[in-house]
From Swiss-Prot:
It comes from the Eukaryota. GO terms for cellular component: cytoplasm; cytosol; Golgi apparatus; TRAPP complex; TRAPPIII protein complex. Component of the multisubunit TRAPP (transport protein particle) complex, which includes at least TRAPPC2, TRAPPC2L, TRAPPC3, TRAPPC3L, TRAPPC4, TRAPPC5, TRAPPC8, TRAPPC9, TRAPPC10, TRAPPC11 and TRAPPC12. This is Trafficking protein particle complex subunit 11. The modification N6-acetyllysine is found at residue 245. It comes from Homo sapiens (Human). Involved in endoplasmic reticulum to Golgi apparatus trafficking at a very early stage. Belongs to the TRAPPC11 family.
Length: 1133
């Protein structure tokens, strides 16, 4: 029996489509016919009707139709389903035969052509004798036909042609060969599809009619057969709902059949076919849960129907195929849009298929283990006359025999032997690997990493059994990384054991050594005797000898491997193998730890290397090297012990390089750092531990950084979480888990022995030359040289501060923008022990706020470390935060000559500018001078002189000045008129005389200037006296270019009598002035209101008395009447 018998037939797996044959087309030599055929077949879209087309000659012989039975009373079926039945109805027996014929309605030789067409149709009918296949005629015409009813000749000839061909009008079609050929073809397809539907409907009714003659005693097989046929025809008819329903019925009928060893394979085969159809249709109907439920039911019903014990491997092969087929269906549905999840995806079915394939392999190994002398039977009992079986699932040596009794036991025995011998030639590993590969791809797609790893291990083992060791190692290496990272040590040990076998059988030296190192380590769960064997083999390899074979290896493979090992030993080449241990868990652990996170350059750098062995026996290493990021230190950190190759495993505990299992070995290293590395990090880049020697083979274990391997991080985490009390160890031993890797340290400068003091008077004032006195004193025991000072604004602050801060050593010069914010490397000479020096630093801060200033002093000094003299560069820095504040606040305001606040001033009218300077400094300030610089638009009424020269202001004190100004008429200026600048020259009172004076410029505010039509001012004494005449003169000045008509009136006051014009109307010419004279006579003492002068301008009605009162006084102080003093009074006084 062929090993491919378990594959489902192609006709079962494909989508059934109506089969239509096309005759009369010469697709090779006729271009028109070729275009018609291409339109039917090429680039068919999914929305076109499901039809399978085939071009056949008109006289093609179709399968003969067997005579119909009138009775099934004496008929005993020989099987359930014939092997050729599905293919026959898919590809051999058409539902419709279409005869293509070139004939136009206006054909001159119509009669002859009609007769020829009828003959062709008759030939087709003869070849379909007994079939219900439909026949149709398509006339290929050159002209586009007229609409129905308009072409009378066409109607008549069409009817005549139908009569001649014995066709109905629905079976005659016209195909014009025009530019719209595809459109006509699609319409033809739809018509063909209707004819095919009719044919399959007829076939379903025909099969159903047979069921009436069946009985369940002798025709059980026919019930299954007919139900399957009805379902299959329904699929061809594209009635998938009815197809599914009938397949379900057929499936139930299969399991109602009486099962025996002789027919169990046929029952399972048909059950598998029908189950496949049911599941496929469920997925097609988008009911995946129904498909899964059906498949589970199918497996539950069939998994115990094993059949012959001698052929039980066939049952596993069948089970494997069931799972694989369902996995394929599931995957196909997903590609068409179905959504799967982690817990329900095709990978589980491929995995189960692989499991049964493995079971098949094991059973075949047991049942097919015949001796080499056993020959394959002749004649071959598995051969048939036609080369294929008549019925699915039957044995070739007893086809059609339904008896449960074996009529010829000898033939049965020979047949079983033939199957077993054929099974022995099956490459099971290839089948298993393919299934596992499919499963891995699915689990990877659905993000199931552990399932993927588990199956990859199985794939690796299958490759090992298939003797493809290279692929096996590739897969196992991939999985080992996952198992190490997750701590699955038992699984890792199993995988490593297989990998070690592969590397041995391939004689791969480096891989063999690597896997041996890990199997000896703490991650391995092997017993001590197994580890001892591996350790011995490892030492043999290092001594350039062949290792002993690994247990349970194939004998022939071992012999081949021994030859390979012998060749490896004889070949000359590199005998040093460097193995990076970061990605696996070797039997030696290493940790590096510096004694401190930083070392001063004048102190030796010290660190320890801790080593611990986990192998069964003490082992001696030959060399230890530590590498740094600065390779000049490598030479100081090497330990080497010469030993012979055969001493590696000797039970010696002497020597630094001999490691005892479970004991921690500590190795101390120290060296003097270079002065150039001050401020740099020294890192241990790698630790190399050599096993063996160069005369044999040498393995160098390389730890990156300060040690640690693939399991270290997980072990450190577990140790940190553990509350278990550690046992007390002797003083010279340490707990391995308590050692923390510290692979880097910092080289820092020697501790300076100087003092740096800063003397200043904060806060700093804006723009002043602020003095900072730096005092440096040496406390070293020897002279220090090349002392340098760096001082100024500390780097890394706001860029705006850098631009507005300037530093200098010369306080007599005022800093400008060219001065830096930081002075670097100012040489200040040498200092003897106890000697000190001072430097004065001047800082100018242009903006307020906090600033951090740095004073950095560096120097050189000679010192001795480990009997080696070095030059150390020491430094000390001090930082100070200085707040910068404004020295004073300046307030400016405009008032009238009456000291009333002004929102605006009036052209040519004097007003007062008042400045108020308030000290905000905590230190006394000296105002050296002040100056008012007027804008061109302003003029002064009197001489401008500073009123605050050399005034000293304490905190909170203020100094004020007053200036009388006026502004000429400038017209209406938007935004007001510029006043000018107020310049203040000042310095800190405590500052030295040579410190420059600071000038602060205050920009005065703009003022709004307005023109008035009439200006009035009054001349009157500063006070009056009761009952004494008080002369008052009013000056009225016309400020316009027009003649002003002025009405003047005086309102009396209770405190005064007056003489003069009480009411008058007068005219004032442009630019001229008019005077009004009055004598006021005070009646009461005190601060009295003057008689009110009211003015009305006829041309300027908006000129109000309220505006007028801004310019003239409204009240005056009146003293009481004085007494005449006589001489006596004077004398008494």
């Amino acid at each position: 029996m062929s090993p491919t018998q378990w594959d489902f037939p192609v006709e079962l797996c494909c989508r059934p489509m109506a089969f239509v044959t096309l005759t009369g087309l010469d697709v090779v030599y006729n271009a028109v016919h070729r275009a018609v055929w291409d339109a039917f077949c090429a680039n068919r879209r999914a929305d076109r009707v499901p039809i399978s087309f085939k071009v056949l000659p008109g006289d093609h012989e179709y399968p003969k139709c067997r005579p119909k039975r009138t009775s099934y009373e004496w008929y005993i079926p020989k099987g359930i389903l014939k092997t050729g039945w599905m293919n026959k109805h898919l590809n051999l027996v058409p539902a419709l035969v279409v005869v293509f014929y070139e004939l136009d309605w206006d054909e001159p030789q119509w009669k002859e052509k009609q007769s020829e067409c009828a003959t062709r149709v008759e030939i087709v009918r003869q070849s379909l004798q007994g079939r219900n296949t439909k026949v149709a005629v398509v006339l290929i015409q050159k002209k586009t036909p007229l609409p129905p009813g308009e072409d009378v000749i066409a109607s008549e000839r069409a009817a005549a042609l139908c009569n001649a061909c014995e066709l109905s009008g629905k079976s005659l079609f016209v195909l014009p060969h025009t530019d719209h050929l595809v459109g006509y073809i699609i319409r033809l397809e739809n018509a063909f599809y209707e004819h095919a539907q009719t044919y399959y409907y007829t076939e379903i009714r025909r099969v159903k009619s047979h069921k009436e003659f069946l009985n369940k005693t002798t025709h059980q097989l026919l019930f299954v057969r007919h139900q399957f046929k009805i379902a299959f025809f329904s699929e061809l008819k594209q009635d998938t709902q009815n197809a599914l329903k009938n397949y379900r019925t057929a499936y139930n009928l299969v399991h109602e059949l009486r099962a025996h060893e002789t027919n169990i394979l046929e029952i399972k085969t048909m059950a598998g076919f029908i189950n496949y159809k049911i599941c496929r249709l469920c997925f097609q109907h988008n009911t995946p849960l129904d498909a899964i439920a059906q498949f589970r039911k199918h497996i539950d019903l069939c998994k115990k129907k094993i059949g012959s014990a001698e052929l039980s491997f066939e049952h596993d092969a069948w089970m494997s195929k069931q799972f694989q087929a369902f996995g394929d269906l599931f995957d196909e549905a997903i590609k068409l849009g179905l959504t799967a999840i982690q817990t329900q995806n095709p990978g589980f079915y491929y995995q189960q298929a692989a499991y049964y394939a493995q079971e098949r392999k094991q059973l075949a190994k047991t049942l097919c283990n015949h001796e080499a002398s056993v020959m394959y039977p002749n004649p071959d009992p598995l051969e048939t006359q036609t080369g294929v079986l008549d019925f699915y699932g039957q044995r070739s040596w007893r086809q059609g025999i339904l008896s449960f009794d074996l009529s010829d036991p000898e033939k049965e025995k020979v047949g079983i032997l033939a199957i077993q011998l054929k099974e022995r030639n099956v490459v099971h590993s290839e089948i298993i690997i393919t299934l596992l590969s499919n499963a891995v791809a699915q689990f990877k797609k659905y993000k199931c990493p552990r399932m993927k790893s588990h199956l990859m291990v199985q794939m690796g083992e299958e490759y090992y059994y298939a003797k493809d060791y290279t692929k096996a190692l590739k897969l196992l290496d991939y999985v080992m990384c996952d198992y190490r990272s997750e701590g699955w040590w038992t699984l890792l040990t199993s995988v490593l054991t297989t990998a070690l076998k592969c590397s041995y059988l391939m004689a791969q030296l480096k891989d063999y050594i690597t896997y041996s190192l890990e199997l000896l380590g703490r991650a391995s769960t092997l017993k001590d005797d197994q580890k001892s064997r591996i350790e011995k083999n490892l030492i043999n390899v290092l001594m350039n000898e062949s290792p002993d074979p690994e247990p349970d290896c194939d004998i022939l493979a071992v012999k081949t491997a021994q030859k390979l090992w012998a060749d490896r030993i004889s070949l000359a080449g590199s005998n040093i193998f460097t193995i990076g241990v970061q990605d696996f868990v070797p039997f030696v652990q290493c940790k590096a730890k510096f004694h401190a996170p930083s070392f001063h350059v004048d102190v030796p750098v010290q660190f320890d290397i801790y080593l611990k062995a986990d192998c069964p026996h003490p082992i001696r290493f030959s060399k230890l090297c530590v590498s740094f990021n600065n390779q000049e230190y490598n030479q100081f950190c090497v330990i080497e012990e010469a030993s012979k190759a055969n001493e590696v495993l000797e039970n010696l505990t002497q020597g630094k390089m001999c490691l005892v299992p479970g004991k921690t070995r500590k190795l101390l290293f120290k060296f003097v750092a270079k002065t150039e590395d001050v401020g740099k990090k020294i890192e241990i880049t790698s630790v190399d531990l050599a096993l063996g020697n160069e005369t044999g083979r040498c393995v160098v274990l390389n730890w990156q950084g300060g040690g640690g391997d693939a399991a270290s991080s997980q072990e450190a985490l577990q140790a940190a979480r553990s509350f278990k009390r550690r046992p007390k160890l002797p003083d010279n031993e340490v707990h391995w888990d308590s050692i923390i890797i510290q692979a880097s340290t910092m080289i820092i400068s020697r501790v300076p022995n100087i003092s740096v003091h800063l003397l200043h008077e904060p806060p700093a004032l804006t723009n002043e030359m602020y003095c900072l006195v730096v005092t440096v004193q040496s406390h070293e025991k020897t002279q220090i040289r090349d002392v340098k000072l760096t001082a100024g604004l500390k780097p890394g602050q706001d860029a705006n501060l850098t631009q507005k801060t300037h530093v200098t050593l010369h306080g007599t010069e005022l800093c400008d923008e060219s001065y830096p914010a930081l002075l670097t490397d100012i040489p200040v000479g040498d200092l003897h022990p106890g000697e000190q020096l001072e430097k004065m630093l001047y800082v100018r801060c242009g903006t307020v706020g906090s600033r951090m200033f740095l004073v950095y002093v560096s120097y050189l000094i000679n010192t001795t470390v480990e009997e080696k003299e070095i030059v150390c560069k020491c430094h000390k820095d001090e930082t100070v935060t200085i707040e910068t504040v404004f020295p004073f606040d300046v307030a400016v305001k405009f008032v009238s000559t009456k000291f009333e606040h002004l929102e605006r001033v009036y052209a040519d009218i004097p007003f007062l500018l008042m400045t108020d300077l308030l000290s905000a400094s905590p230190w006394a300030l000296t105002i050296v001078s002040s100056e008012l610089q007027l804008a061109p638009s302003m003029t002064t009424v009197d001489q401008l002189e500073s009123q605050v020269d050399n005034v000293i202001l304490q905190t909170g004190e203020s100094a004020s000045e007053c200036f009388c100004l006026q502004c000429p008429s400038l017209g209406n200026i938007e935004g007001g008129v510029a006043t000018g600048h107020y310049i203040i020259s000042w310095k800190r009172t405590s500052a030295m005389e040579n410190i420059p004076i600071i000038t602060t410029v205050i920009t005065l505010p703009h003022v709004i200037v307005e023109n008035i039509p009439l200006h009035v001012n009054a001349d009157l004494p500063s006070f009056g006296r009761v009952r004494e005449s008080l002369p008052v003169k009013y000056h009225l000045q016309n400020k316009t270019d027009l003649v002003q008509d002025v009405e003047i009136s005086v309102e009396p006051s209770d405190a005064f009598m007056f003489s003069g014009l009480k009411q008058i109307r007068l005219r004032i010419l442009p630019g001229t002035e008019q005077e009004m004279l009055y004598n006021f006579y005070p009646l009461m003492a005190g601060y009295q209101q003057l008689p009110s002068l009211n003015i009305n301008l006829l041309r300027f009605p908006n000129f109000t008395n309220q505006l007028l009162r801004r310019f003239i006084p409204t009240s005056i102080f009146v003293k009481p009447q004085g007494r005449l003093m006589d001489d006596t009074s004077i004398a008494a006084a």
